[in-house]
Amino acid sequence: GAYLALAGVALLSMAVLAFITFPAAPAKQANGEGRPLREIMRQPVFMVAAACGALGFGVMNLLMAATPLAMQQCSLPFSDVALVLEWHVIGMFAPGFFTGHLIKRFGVLPIMGVGVLLNAACIVIALSGVDLHQFLIALFLLGVGWNFLFTGSTTLSLQTYTPAEKDRAQGALNFFVFATTALSSFASGVLVTTQGWQLLNAGSLIPVALTGAALVWLKTRPQAVPAQSL
């Protein structure tokens, strides 16, 4: 049943994509291949986009992957685990229908800041107890926070490279993001079983705080961010 449902979703996606007209790829710059990757990565906007994308994704994956083990330790049934993860996934992807509009209206940095606050709220709720409703609300907020941070960091990074530099810049950004995600996957099970759910969440406040600090730092450097992004 589950595989048939996935096949149906895949077919629906193909049908939707068949009616989308994608813009033609811009021509390469005539004056060469653009700046070296090191120069692109040294830009404050790129550094903040990479840091927020990596830390936001890492925290989300760390807590999400640890949640089933933590709920099992709390003797909650598998049906509750499934419900929590379902709402977490809804929180991750449902905002995608309007996150772009929010960024256009309010700016990318404020939306990313809301993502940081949602992650912090998730941790506070998770630290308040281990009942079903606390897991449910915390993981839903974590999903929405991830959406705002990941979409925002991707949008922010678009300002840091030209079409000729796109492949290298996006490759570097994805490396930072998904290397951090992989590390968090390896660490989550070990940390939740050896340190516990409460300490895992308390420790997650550190990367959340670093993400917020990076946004504040960039905000204090308005010359590094175009006006429409503030």
Regions found by a protein language model. Give the residues of each.
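C-terminal membrane-cytosol helix-exit motif in multi-pass small-molecule transporters
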Residues: 5-27, 214-219
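Intracellular juxtamembrane helix-capping segments at the cytosolic ends
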Residues: 148-161
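Helix-to-loop junctions at the C-terminal end of transmembrane segments
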Residues: 94-108, 192
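Structural signature of the two symmetry-related core transmembrane helices
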Residues: 110-124, 205
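Juxtamembrane intracellular "pre-TM" segments in multi-pass secondary transporters
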Residues: 22-49
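Pair of pore-lining "gating" transmembrane helices in MFS-fold secondary transporters
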Residues: 42-60, 140
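A membrane-interface helix-boundary motif in multi-pass transporters
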Residues: 1-8, 190-208
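A late C-terminal transmembrane helix in Major Facilitator Superfamily
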Residues: 164-195
